[in-house]
From Swiss-Prot:
Its biological purpose: F(1)F(0) ATP synthase produces ATP from ADP in the presence of a proton or sodium gradient. F-type ATPases consist of two structural domains, F(1) containing the extramembraneous catalytic core and F(0) containing the membrane proton channel, linked together by a central stalk and a peripheral stalk. During catalysis, ATP synthesis in the catalytic domain of F(1) is coupled via a rotary mechanism of the central stalk subunits to proton translocation. Key component of the F(0) channel; it plays a direct role in translocation across the membrane. A homomeric c-ring of between 10-14 subunits forms the central stalk rotor element with the F(1) delta and epsilon subunits.
This protein's name: ATP synthase subunit c
Entry-linked Gene3D superfamilies: F1F0 ATP synthase subunit C (1.20.20.10)
SUPFAM superfamilies for this protein: F1F0 ATP synthase subunit C
Keywords associated with the record: ATP synthesis, Cell membrane, CF(0), Hydrogen ion transport, Ion transport, Lipid-binding, Membrane, Transmembrane, Transmembrane helix, Transport
GO molecular function, one term: proton-transporting ATP synthase activity, rotational mechanism
Membrane topology value: Multi-pass membrane protein
Gene: atpE
Major localisation: membrane
NCBIfam families noted in UniProt: ATP_synt_c (TIGR01260), PRK06876.1 (NF005363)
Cellular compartments per GO CC: plasma membrane; proton-transporting ATP synthase complex; proton-transporting two-sector ATPase complex, proton-transporting domain
Compartments (UniProt record): Cell membrane
Site residues by UniProt (Reversibly protonated during proton transport): E56
Length: 72
């Protein structure tokens, strides 16, 4: 097994771990905000989806980097 494959696995795993933690924090804070001010549910939900989309970009970048590292 080459070091490129190990590096790719680490890159994908860490990016997925980071995204999972980030998504959990974003959603939990949104739920707290809606519980405090239910009238802002729509605005908070929109901001939450934008935040989740930005956080999910990291694993995609991690996979791209993993493919680049594997092909070297």
């Amino acid at each position: 097994m080459s070091l490129g494959v190990i590096a790719a696995a680490i890159a994908i795993g860490l990016s997925a771990l980071g995204a999972g933690i980030g998504n959990g924090l974003i959603v939990s804070r949104t739920i707290e905000g809606v519980a405090r001010q239910p009238e802002l549910k729509g605005a908070l939900q929109t901001i939450m989806f934008i935040g989740v989309a930005l956080v999910e970009a990291l694993p995609i970048i991690g996979v791209v980097i993993a493919f680049i590292v594997m092909n070297r």
